[in-house]
Curated annotation (Swiss-Prot):
Keyword terms of this UniProt record: 4Fe-4S, Cytoplasm, Iron, Iron-sulfur, Metal-binding, S-adenosyl-L-methionine, Transferase
Protein name, as recorded: Ribosomal protein uS12 methylthiotransferase RimO
Pfam families recorded: Radical_SAM, TRAM_2, UPF0004
Localization per Swiss-Prot or TrEMBL: Cytoplasm
Coiled-coil stretches noted in the UniProt entry, renumbered to this chain: none
Enzyme type, top EC level: transferase
Any one biological process term the GO annotation gives: tRNA modification
The gene coding this protein: rimO
Domain of life where this protein originates: Bacteria
Catalytic activity, reaction form: L-aspartate(89)-[ribosomal protein uS12]-hydrogen + (sulfur carrier)-SH + AH2 + 2 S-adenosyl-L-methionine = 3-methylsulfanyl-L-aspartate(89)-[ribosomal protein uS12]-hydrogen + (sulfur carrier)-H + 5'-deoxyadenosine + L-methionine + A + S-adenosyl-L-homocysteine + 2 H(+)
Function: Catalyzes the methylthiolation of an aspartic acid residue of ribosomal protein uS12.
Chain ranges of the MTTase N-terminal domain: 5-115
Species: Histophilus somni (strain 129Pt) (Haemophilus somnus)
Family: Belongs to the methylthiotransferase family. RimO subfamily.
Domain TRAM: 377-443
Amino acid sequence: MSSSPNIGFISLGCPKNLVDSERILTELRSDGYNIISSYEGADLVIVNTCGFIDSAVQESLESIGEALENNGKVIVTGCLGAKENQIREIHPQVLEITGPHSYEAVMKHVHKYVPKPEYSPYTSLVPKHGIKLTPKHYAYLKISEGCDHRCTFCIIPSMRGDLDSRSIVHILDEAKRLVDAGVKEILVVSQDTSAYALDKKKENASKTVFWNGMPIKNDLITLCEKLGSLGAWVRLHYVYPYPHVDNLIPLMAEGKILPYLDIPLQHASPKILKMMKRPGSIERTLERIKKWREICPDLTLRSTFIVGFPGETEEDFQLLLDFLQEAQLDRVGCFKFSPVEGAVATDMEDQIPEEIKEERFHRFMQLQQKISAERLRQKIGRTLPVIIDEIDEEGIIGRTMADAPEIDGVVYVDNFSKVEVKLGQIINVTITNADEYDLWGEI
């Protein structure tokens, strides 16, 4: 039995929150704590919460309650932690509460209730790239915190603050450690990836810096070029449609980063986009998509949209459907508008009844499923590189360059017994079949 204190840990929410959890776990292990996956035997439990939408808030509150019931000693951090009063009202017995990315405060509270061990065997087991909660062959890389936009449906800036970009040197150093440790795919995340380093320009701090003895600029294009030189797949998420995003497409065409753009557009009605405080020129967006595909024919476009936003008429919704038909996006997520405490849109007039939201959601998804199915069918007969995520007796499950883990489709490979393969390996697969979301193929 180890003499090191045991810390239980619950991580909720998005990949950005997962990165925060990984950092806290790394610091816990570096300080000699043992991380366990159960309440029983834990000297303390940390719950890293999500507070983006009401369902996430409810899940976080329930997880806190479960930890209290089964253990009793609980520290809360994460996005919902920015609303301490809301947590205390339901769970007053929580020991301490901090907001998101409050790593030092979390560790200070842990030390207060469970003193740091004088010696622990776990301190020597921390890998150079830190503790990761993802499979060994891919990892999330957070490049900034916060967001300068004030979209009316979102409360992230009130929780995570304004844009705060990391140093390009620190990001590249972390990325190199990941690749050196065997990571084959780096998933770049933030609240607003395309805004990377724009805050430093405002502060006149975007000067040339040195990495590996060479001068480099502290900007998004340079970051992507350098990440692409490390030898791993590089996938960009949460890209706001700034004009300079156009400059990323040639890098994708050249194979420096994956030809994959996760660009949340949210709607297509100029009226609704204006109410959301989002960019409103859909004609311009369609022109850009056409140009992007001319430069990089293999480009995969993923986006997310909201239906049932306050004031959305049938005409507004039809504009959204028309846009989907014309844009022919590859991967699309759809959310029914959900009131969030603190969001401007929650108090707007003309809230849409739930039954209309539901009906529009289904119409949206029916159309997009047809589009996605047709775009996937176009891949039948092609031989594509596939990264292996799972291997079992039934076959291989992997992903193409067009598929991010968790949110996109997969490739099922049946005849894997003909060759020896391992997790994280990138193999060539000939596509034989497709449906609305997934592909099937053979080696």
